[in-house]
Amino acid sequence: MSNALSLKRPILLWSFASLFFAFQFIIRLSTGILREEIIQKFAIDTIAFGTLAGYYYIGYAGMQIPIGIMLDKFDFRVVTFVSILVTVLGTVIFVTSSHFNYLLIGRLMIGAGSAVGFLSVAKITTKYFPVKYHSIMLGLSFTFGLMGAVFAVTPMKLLFNHFGYNYTFYTLAAVGFGIGLIILLIKNDQPEQATYNHDVTNNKSLILKLFLNPTLLFIGLLGGLMVGGLEGFADEWAIPFFTQIYQLNEMESNIATSLVYVGMCFGGPILVFLADLLKSHNSIIIIAGVMMGIIFVILLFCSSLNFLTTSILMFLLGIFCCYQVLIFTIVSSLVPTKSAGLAIATVNCINMLFGHIFHKFMSIVISYNWDGLVNNSNVPIYSRNDFIMAISIIPVCCIIGIIGFMYLFQKSKIKLQTTTKEVTV
């Protein structure tokens, strides 16, 4: 009986870590759903709201590497619990704040604690499960997390409307604390899988070298230029864009936006398959960037789009947003195996920082061009031109990123094997 229980414990750890990975997506995307309520309650302008949205990415990016190091150095259950606790406290601060500065602190804490999400899943997977199961378990965790993102849009809006966002957030905080407590209390006697053990946590010179590696920094910069479709548009601006520009109702706008995350569930496997089929990861990255640019040109400059068309475009956008999987594969091929996880974390930090940059830039531009028109709730109403001026930065940055990758691939002659290497976090 005890042996059977011992075998189940790693599965339980993995399940609850994956559940938190989905949970943090729900908290992350809630700001976009509550945009009007937040602007009205705190009497802030769009620039301040853009700052609020971007604080999540600052916290997430800033803690990505420190949490990764702590997961290796200390008991991963304790590190995961503390990180989840930070997320929960940030959620409570976010919902109870009566001052905008406290709201910023709560959002920052949510981002910082959420950085443990996928890292803890990867740690549990590599610690307790055979190598042959790593890819499928990490893939399932990622898909599960994206299902949380899908739930965070339309279903969460329904919950907010029915119960109020205060009660809903308190409930989410309680659920998050419960997840963390269960992870902390699960004791596992299952022996760790024998893996190549490399201690990069104490090698400060290696960390410094990776941060100063021009190729990695260039890849991180170029990848960051292409994240605007997801972290800049879908996370916060898609819903008001569809509502005000294409006159979709609130439910249709929410559903269309959520399809980005549905598309991402399929995007990783599809792009990897195409990259292996064409024997060129480089080409698929370029194609994905071009397609994202085309999608935004259609969204911005078509005179009329219906619900079905916007839904299809957002689903396709989600597929092409998974170009990052191929970038991480390239990164892992450029460094020694023992450094791959830290190298990927370095590039991911840069990518996540661009989430803040896009939010800040777009909010400044759209506010600058705004004509002062507001609705009955005193929330700004933007024209098509306002949105075009702000959101155009996304396809422009995509083009710059594509050109940069073409230059990098040509200069470095990066060649990858036809099969995708497993990337560990």
Report each predicted region and the residues it spans:
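Extracytoplasmic gate region of multi-pass secondary transporters
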Residues: 31-33, 214-271, 355-363
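Helix-breaking motifs and short loop linkers at transmembrane-helix boundaries and internal kinks
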Residues: 43, 75, 96-102, 130, ...
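Cytoplasmic helix-loop-helix junction between adjacent transmembrane helices
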Residues: 106-144
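Conserved MFS/SLC helix-loop-helix module at the cytosolic interface between two early adjacent transmembrane helices
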Residues: 62-101
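Juxtamembrane intracellular "pre-TM" segments in multi-pass secondary transporters
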Residues: 2-7, 190-220, 422-425
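Helix-loop-helix hairpin linking two adjacent transmembrane segments in secondary transporters
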Residues: 140-189
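Paired small-residue
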Residues: 90, 101-109, 308-316
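Cytoplasmic membrane-interface "Motif A"-like loop-to-helix N-cap segments
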Residues: 73-83, 276-290
